[in-house]
From Swiss-Prot:
PROSITE patterns: YCGL (PS51648). This is YcgL domain-containing protein KPN78578_22820. Pfam families: YcgL. Transmembrane segments: none annotated. It comes from the Bacteria. Residues 1-85 form the YcgL domain. It comes from Klebsiella pneumoniae subsp. pneumoniae (strain ATCC 700721 / MGH 78578).
Length: 93
């Protein structure tokens, strides 16, 4: 199984995985509008692979077979104030 990964032009660190190059037929229109013009990032073989860097391999495979796409969102931003206060033994309000 192969997938094609596209980078969003509207949302930083957001990627769309599809089964075939330039085939967005199974991706909802609303998602495509909010994603922007897809920029191809890479073609990736999924078979024989044990893991992906920022996505769960099994979830990607399942989403591709069931819905035809997988959307990878950026990791949540770190709350530096909360982290600093935790290190100081305090709580933020």
């Amino acid at each position: 199984m192969f997938c094609v990964i596209y980078r969003s032009t509207k949302r930083e660190q957001t990627y769309l995985y599809v089964e075939k190059k330039d085939d967005f037929s199974r991706v909802p229109d609303e998602l495509m509008r909010s994603f922007g013009t897809p920029q191809m990032a890479m073609l990736l073989p999924l078979d024989g692979r044990k893991k992906l860097v920022n996505a769960d391999l099994e979830k990607v495979k399942q989403a591709l077979s069931e819905q035809g796409y997988y959307l990878q969102l950026p990791p949540p931003s770190e709350n530096l104030l909360k982290k600093h206060l935790a290190e100081q033994g305090k709580q933020s309000d």
